[in-house]
């Protein structure tokens, strides 16, 4: 146990994740590209909208030339039709970080989605995947009977949480 604790401490001392956060159009992207060029590293986006291929307007994505110059992760990563969550983002990002830290010792994470950033910086509670048929059933109940029906079910099944 002590050896693994020592190894973890050495890993953390050797490897650094630099986080650049802030509101849209505050200069985060330009700063991250400047730093990545200077440090010879890659960029991980923690933006909940830049991840989607179809969302380009209003998301302040890096330019095509910036994307060619510096390796960016999670820009145009998937379609808006794909199911995605902060939990999935957290798992994928942690895998990428492990891989990157085997090659380089500093990585830049940039974006304004606080929940995405917090999932990496502080961790996230893991929840089991909800079965598709359960989701469909609850959505149907909501559409047909409204939120009051869902609230009464919650009160019945988990009165402590409901209150």
Question: Language model features by range: what are they?
Answer:
Residues 2-163:
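Phosphate/pyrophosphate-binding catalytic cores of soluble transferases and nucleic-acid-acting enzymes
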């Amino acid at each position: 146990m002590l050896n693994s604790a020592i190894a973890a401490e050495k890993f953390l001392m050797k490897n650094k994740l630099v986080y650049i956060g802030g509101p849209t159009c505050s200069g985060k992207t330009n700063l991250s590209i400047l730093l990545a060029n200077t440090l010879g590293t890659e960029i991980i986006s923690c933006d909940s909208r830049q991840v989607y291929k179809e969302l380009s307007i209003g998301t302040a994505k890096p330019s095509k030339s910036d994307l060619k110059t510096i390796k960016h992760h999670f820009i145009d990563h998937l379609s808006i039709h794909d199911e995605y969550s902060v939990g999935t983002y957290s798992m994928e990002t942690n895998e990428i970080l492990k891989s990157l830290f085997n090659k380089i010792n500093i990585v830049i994470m940039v974006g304004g989605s606080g929940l995405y950033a917090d999932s990496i910086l502080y961790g996230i509670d893991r929840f089991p995947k909800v079965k598709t048929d359960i989701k469909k059933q609850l959505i149907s109940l909501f559409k047909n009977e409204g939120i009051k029906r869902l609230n009464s079910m919650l009160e019945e099944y988990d009165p402590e949480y409901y209150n």
